[in-house]
Amino acid sequence: MNANWNFDNSYARLPERFFTRIYPTPVSDPKLVVLNHSLAKELGLNAEVLASEEGVAVFAGNRVPEGAEPLAQAYAGHQFGYFNMLGDGRAILLGEHVTPSGERVDIQLKGSGRTPYSRGGDGRAALGPMLREYIISEAMHALGIPTTRSLAVVTTGEVVMRETELPGAILTRVAASHLRVGTFQYAGRFLSKEELQALADYAIKRHYPNGEHASNRYVFLLEEVMKKQAALVAKWQLVGFIHGVMNTDNMTISGETIDYGPCAFMDVYDPETVFSSIDTQGRYAYGNQPYIAGWNIARFAESLLPLLHDEEEKAIEIAQKVIEQFPALYETYWLQGMRAKLGLWTEEAEDKKLIGELLHLMYTHRLDYTNTFRSLTLEEWHFCEQELRDWYTRWQQRIARQDMTKEEVYECMRQNNPAIIPRNYRVEEALAAAVEHGDDTVMERLLHVLSDPYAYMEEQEEYAKTPEPSDRPYRTFCGT
């Protein structure tokens, strides 16, 4: 029996300045903590072999499967607005696995040792942050939001030094690719036009093959990435997800959410909500995310300028015409999603005002974002405040004007308003049990209820509860 790995490594065929070939650093005593059986099945992999000693050795970096070509990717990026040379400092791409259906996915080991891009770091990861990424990335997938996935987490048998000694771990991340805006910034700043063109052609072939026949394939690439990112960030906003570190190296060309370091979900609705301990200025606050996405797309456009037109002025003009569409594009996706959350399948000019009024009421009355929509969906709008009751009446009048039965309206809402999100305090409970006490059952229960967030199951009731009020704000940390 074998695991059914099927590697074909197209990124490794790019010019060599895009990566460094390097093997993972072996670890002393790897142990499997969690394996994603459903994802393994989707990938055509044998879960039984993956869970064996041989499979765990692959997840730990102690064994490289046949056909893999391990490498660390080079990229740059704006981090909190400042440009830096970066790269995979603690992650190694084993290669690209091609599934039985022909889908190509990256298999990356995160926390697998030092690389030439480690910049003084130890190349390792702690168990808590790796389990956190596993939980939240799988929850995001269940919510219907494009995301990298998590195949497994193993402990290494070694400790990593952060504020204190922590158990070391490695996450196996699965992605459509790890091409980033920062990959293009690296090529645009440090490499030749020919190398930049090779990267752009590769991205088009891998992610946007229709662009191979476009009149200007590089304008097409810019437009498609912009659309994907506008749609992605709209989906984040619709569920109250705050990424926390929207640097350009964390914006994928594929349109998947990547890097779950300091992310969290908003409880009480407040556009200024920030959880990340390092985001002291609120650059990546909930309400800023659409603007930052547009800013990042502008950086992507800058990196593509040499390919858009031979004359720089004309290239800039072309880029500006594309990126100035981002705000309207984002709003279209967001309004479409908000209408669905309110059971509105027709469009009326006053819809934006109705939505804005609800958000304002949530803000002034400090209402929980997720549970407000949940209350509407379950017809449990039991508020005493007159302005909340008045808004409810206006909403009822609005849904009555469309040709849908009441049952159809509420079914639409159930499909678009999750009964449950990964509440920050629930995630922390699961991590504390797993990391401090070696008890994975809390995490397993949480993963189970998060696996079908639109089910409105009785067992989700407990997990839908908001956290107890606290004087201390919830803070997230990068885990690096």
UniProtKB/Swiss-Prot annotation:
Coiled coil (residue ranges)? none
Q: InterPro entries attached here?
A: SelO
State which Enzyme Commission number(s) the record gives.
2.7.7.-, 2.7.7.108
Necessary cofactors: Mg(2+); Mn(2+)
> Which Pfam families does its entry note?
SelO
Presence of the UniProt keyword Lipoprotein in the record: no
Q: Where is the active site?
A: D249
List the GO molecular function terms: AMPylase activity; ATP binding; magnesium ion binding
UniProt keyword annotations, A-Z? ATP-binding, Magnesium, Manganese, Metal-binding, Nucleotide-binding, Nucleotidyltransferase, Transferase
Q: Per UniProt, where does ATP bind? A: G87, G89, R90, K110, D122, G123, R173, R180, D259
- Which positions bind Mg(2+)? N250, D259
On whether Plastid is a keyword of this UniProt record, the answer is no
Q: Which reaction does it catalyse?
A: L-seryl-[protein] + ATP = 3-O-(5'-adenylyl)-L-seryl-[protein] + diphosphate; L-threonyl-[protein] + ATP = 3-O-(5'-adenylyl)-L-threonyl-[protein] + diphosphate; L-tyrosyl-[protein] + ATP = O-(5'-adenylyl)-L-tyrosyl-[protein] + diphosphate; L-histidyl-[protein] + UTP = N(tele)-(5'-uridylyl)-L-histidyl-[protein] + diphosphate
Q: What does this protein do?
A: Nucleotidyltransferase involved in the post-translational modification of proteins. It can catalyze the addition of adenosine monophosphate (AMP) or uridine monophosphate (UMP) to a protein, resulting in modifications known as AMPylation and UMPylation.
> What family name appears in the similarity comment?
Belongs to the SELO family.
Q: What is this protein called?
A: Protein nucleotidyltransferase YdiU
User: Which species is the source of this protein?
Assistant: Anoxybacillus flavithermus (strain DSM 21510 / WK1)
